[in-house]
From Swiss-Prot:
Recorded family membership: Belongs to the QueA family.
This protein's name: S-adenosylmethionine:tRNA ribosyltransferase-isomerase
Pathway(s) it belongs to: tRNA modification; tRNA-queuosine biosynthesis
Origin: domain of life: Bacteria
Pfam families associated with the record: Queuosine_synth (PF02547)
Gene3D superfamilies named among the record's database cross-references: QueA-like (3.40.1780.10)
Amino acid sequence: MRVDDFDYELPPELIAQEPLDRRDATRLMTVDRLKGEVGEVSFREITRLFRPGDLLVVNDTRVIPARFFGVKESGGRVEVFLERRLAAVGERWQCLLRSSKPSRPGTRIVLAEGVSAEVIGRSDGDTWCVSFTPVTGFDEWLERNGAMPLPPYIRRSAADADRERYQTVFSRQRGAVAAPTAGLHFTPELLDELRERGVEIATLTLHVGLGTFMPIRVERVEEHRMHRERYIIPSATADAVNARKGGKGRVIALGTTTCRTLEHAARDDGRVAAGAGETGIFIYPGYHFKTVDALITNFHLPKSTLLMLVSAFAGKELLFRAYHEAVTRRFRFFSYGDAMFVH
């Protein structure tokens, strides 16, 4: 299977650069896999697509303000992009470093408010292991001095408003460097309305990493290796998912991160195990879904692993017809754009 088979033409002006004033003012494309039909409603109407007994599983990860700048002791500005915390004790992180001259082990970086960093050595791929001091209060320092890590296709600097709008209303667990964007459309009122309709809402955590922005660098889909991301599935969530396997209702995944986590933890009978770990699951056409019955997701980049996942779930022909419709109807694409309900 060729990566180029997942390409499509997207006018640049359809890439959303700002969120709408209201989270639920976005548009929702509906994709019926059984009937092969594509429709459209307002996102605030999504509750009528649920049935009593359904389970909505959401990713409660919270995006950290992971981007900031410093100056090397030897001179020269450096941009630091935190990817993940490496040590349970101390502030040792896997980071991207950007500067005019390459970094090397032993490089020291002077940061705001008396904080400093030292490059320890290479980590995975293009990343570095970096140690920060002092370690006390580093999360608070980051909140004051870091910027939200907006995706590269948003052609502007992060603003104060992004600290709220690039988070879901149910974000709790700090650790992501990209938002689970399908969740950005939900308001507390919509979640309450779902509960009133007899829908159960459960949480899991998958800390979205830098790999979500990384292009595929091979020609064949099967040769690609996914980045690994940390996840937690609470016992209550596993129990709620497993109850649906007895016919109580559908398991509806809010976003590809939730979908990947559930499928990673699923057995052949669709039941999932509670626990914590890392997943590098890569889902593309030909994959047999074990536990997810419906998927809410945003529109994804051409030739991306996320587009391949949704192609596997919806069927590639139907999905690309839906994307063609979305372009024709001038839907807004990517993180701050519109959404899709595939069922």
